[in-house]
Regions:
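Ferredoxin-type iron-sulfur electron-transfer modules in oxidoreductases and energy-metabolism complexes
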Residues: 175-202, 216-314
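Glycine-centered loop/turn positions within well-structured domains
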Residues: 81, 212, 273
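Short secondary-structure junctions and interdomain/linker hinges
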Residues: 15, 19-22, 90, 207, ...
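Homeobox/homeodomain signature
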Residues: 145-148, 212, 246
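Disulfide-bonded cysteines in secreted/extracellular proteins and peptides
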Residues: 78, 104, 152-158, 204-210, ...
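Alpha-helix boundary/capping residues
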Residues: 87-90, 204, 282
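Residue-level marker for well-ordered alpha-helical positions
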Residues: 9-10, 198, 208, 250
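Iron-sulfur-associated redox domains of electron-transfer enzymes in respiratory
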Residues: 1-197
C-alpha cells in the first residue's frame, strides 16, 4: 500500500510539474478517524497529502465535469466505469483526463466494523486490510474478520476491481471474484415489499444527496425543479419521494455502474442500492449491456439494429 501511495505522489507531482495536467483529484485523510475525503488541487505542495488506504470510498468521477483544463484523477475499477460512461455521453473529453488506475480489493464499511466489534471508531486503534481478512486492533488486542463481512456491499459484487481504462496503473491487477449476495427484498411478497418501501420513503427528507453524488445524474435542470408542469410537491411526502427515486432510476438506467454512492450518501440510510441494482440487473439481462465497460460503445438505448429482438420493443 505504501509503495503504491509513494508512486501515486510521484506520478501526480510529475504531471503537475511538467504541465501535463492542471488539476489532480485524489484522496486525503479525512477529519474523522478511518476516513478519507476528496483532494482537488493544482498545488504540487498538496500532493504529499494523497493517500491510498482501505477507506478511499468516494467515487471521484463526479468532479470531472466541474473542472476546466486537463485533470489527473485517481480511479478504482468502479470509478473508472463511471468515467467511461461520462466519456460515452460526451460529458468528459478523454483527451483531457489522465486516469491513475488503482487496482482495488474493496473498501471497508466502517459501520460494519463498529457493529462487529461493538465499539465506536474512536475506541478502535487500527484497522488493516490484508489479503482476504481485516485485522481490527482494540486496546492492543487483535480480532480478524473475513473481508466478506466488512467490505462495502457493492465491493462484494464488484465486476471490475482493476480499471480497464487507465493511463497509469498503480499496482498489480486484481482479478474479479464477485460474491453472490442475496437480495432479501426480492424474496418478499409484493405486498410486504410495497409496505417496506412506503416506510423507507416516509423517512426521506428529499435532500437530493443521492442525486448530487451520482456521476450519472448530470441533467442541467432536474425534473423535480420544473414548475410547468410541476411533477413533485416540494414537501417530502412518501408518494412524491418514491416517484422521485423511480424517475431518477429510469433516468440513469444504462449509466449506473453500481458504485453505491447514492446509498452511502443518504443521511437517513435508505437502501437505495436495492433499486439501482435491480435496474442494473434488468439492463444486463434484457440487453446484455453493462455501463462503463467500453468507451467506444454507444450509450445505452442510442444504437439500434434491424435485427433487434422484437419482443423488447413491442
Amino acid at each position: 500500500m505504501e509503495d503504491r501511495q509513494k508512486r501515486l505522489i510521484d506520478e501526480a507531482k510529475a504531471l503537475l510539474e511538467q504541465g501535463k495536467v492542471s488539476w489532480v483529484i485524489g484522496y486525503e485523510p479525512g477529519s474523522l478517524k478511518f476516513t478519507t475525503t476528496p483532494l482537488i488541487t493544482r498545488d504540487k505542495e498538496d500532493i504529499n497529502r494523497l493517500v491510498i488506504n482501505p477507506f478511499i470510498i468516494n467515487n471521484l468521477s463526479n468532479f470531472l465535469t466541474e473542472l476546466e483544463g486537463r485533470v489527473a484523477i485517481v480511479a478504482k475499477g468502479c470509478d473508472s466505469r463511471s468515467i467511461v460512461s461520462l466519456i460515452q455521453d460526451n460529458k468528459v473529453n478523454r483527451d483531457n483526463v489522465v486516469i491513475l488506475g488503482l487496482p482495488c480489493t474493496g473498501v471497508i464499511d466502517l459501520a460494519k466494523i463498529e457493529g462487529l466489534v461493538g465499539r465506536e471508531r474512536d475506541e478502535i486503534d487500527d484497522i488493516t486490510l490484508k489479503d482476504d481478512k481485516v485485522i481490527v486492533t482494540i486496546a492492543g488486542k487483535q480480532r480478524e474478520f473475513p473481508t466478506s463481512e466488512v467490505l462495502c456491499d457493492n465491493c462484494l459484487s464488484c465486476e471490475m476491481p482493476t480499471p480497464e481504462e487507465y493511463d497509469i496503473l498503480l499496482g498489480q491487477p486484481v482479478k474479479p471474484s464477485p460474491l453472490a449476495t442475496p437480495d432479501k427484498l426480492k424474496e418478499m411478497p409484493a405486498e410486504a415489499r410495497w409496505q417496506f418501501w412506503q416506510r423507507e420513503f416516509n423517512r426521506c427528507i428529499r435532500c437530493y444527496a443521492c442525486r448530487s453524488v451520482c456521476p450519472a445524474c448530470f441533467c442541467q435542470r432536474c425534473f423535480v425543479e420544473e414548475t410547468e408542469p410541476q411533477w413533485l410537491l416540494p414537501i417530502p411526502h412518501w408518494q412524491d419521494n418514491l416517484l422521485f427515486q423511480v424517475a431518477r432510476n429510469i433516468h440513469v438506467v444504462g449509466r449506473c455502474t453500481d458504485c453505491g454512492e447514492c446509498e452511502r450518501d443518504c443521511p437517513v440510510n435508505i437502501p437505495l442500492r436495492s433499486l439501482t441494482r435491480e435496474m442494473y440487473g434488468l439492463v444486463d439481462e434484457l440487453f446484455q449491456y453493462k455501463a462503463g465497460m467500453d468507451k467506444e460503445a454507444a450509450p445505452f438505448l442510442t444504437a439500434y439494429e434491424v435485427e433487434e429482438a422484437e419482443d423488447l420493443i413491442r
